């Protein structure tokens, strides 16, 4: 049973999937940093220096805090700023993955075009004439 498991794990598809998941997780952190540390501060500066992560609406009258963390302690909040940030992360990640898939597909198409096409077999009459010629040449 252990040997079967080892064979299963060592197959190319499983290893490729594992590498893809690990790289995907690391890439997700890069996109999070890009959005949180570069894009959102620029957008915040354009809209008055505000941090989108602190945009929220209190869902009860008891919520009167100015920061999201304090507001969550006071009661239920609708944290739409955090949602905007996460949605932007998703859009950027989806676009980058789209570009990567498109590049791989273009590379595959280019490699298929560069492969020489297999020579079509000659028509039956040409093959027969070639055989006759070869037989006559041997005599």
From Swiss-Prot:
Signal sequence interval, chain numbering: none
Keyword terms, alphabetized: Cell inner membrane, Cell membrane, Ion channel, Ion transport, Membrane, Transmembrane, Transmembrane helix, Transport
GO cellular component: plasma membrane
Transmembrane segments: 8-28, 30-50, 81-101
Coiled coil segments of this chain: none
Record-linked InterPro entries: Mechanosensitive_channel_CS, MS_channel, MSC/AndL, MscL_channel
Single GO term (MF): mechanosensitive monoatomic ion channel activity
PROSITE patterns according to UniProt: MSCL
Subcellular location: Cell inner membrane
Similarity-based family: Belongs to the MscL family.
Subunit structure: Homopentamer.
UniProt function note: Channel that opens in response to stretch forces in the membrane lipid bilayer. May participate in the regulation of osmotic pressure changes within the cell.
PANTHER family: LARGE-CONDUCTANCE MECHANOSENSITIVE CHANNEL, MECHANOSENSITIVE CHANNEL MSCL
Protein name: Large-conductance mechanosensitive channel 1
Naturally occurring in which organism (per UniProt): Mesorhizobium japonicum (strain LMG 29417 / CECT 9101 / MAFF 303099)
Organism taxonomic ancestry: Bacteria, Pseudomonadati, Pseudomonadota, Alphaproteobacteria, Hyphomicrobiales
């Amino acid at each position: 049973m252990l040997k079967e498991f080892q064979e299963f794990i060592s197959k190319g598809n499983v290893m490729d999937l594992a590498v893809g998941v690990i790289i995907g997780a690391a890439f997700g952190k890069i996109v999070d940093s890009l959005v949180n540390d570069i894009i959102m501060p620029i957008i915040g500066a354009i809209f008055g220096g505000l941090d989108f992560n602190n945009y929220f609406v209190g869902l009860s009258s008891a919520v009167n805090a100015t920061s999201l963390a304090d507001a969550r302690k006071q009661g239920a909040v609708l944290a739409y700023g955090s949602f905007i940030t996460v949605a932007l992360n998703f859009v950027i990640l989806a676009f980058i993955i789209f570009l990567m898939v498109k590049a791989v597909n273009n590379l595959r198409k280019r490699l298929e075009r560069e492969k020489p096409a297999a020579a079509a077999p000659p028509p039956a009459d040409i093959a027969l004439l070639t055989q006759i010629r070869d037989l006559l040449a041997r005599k």
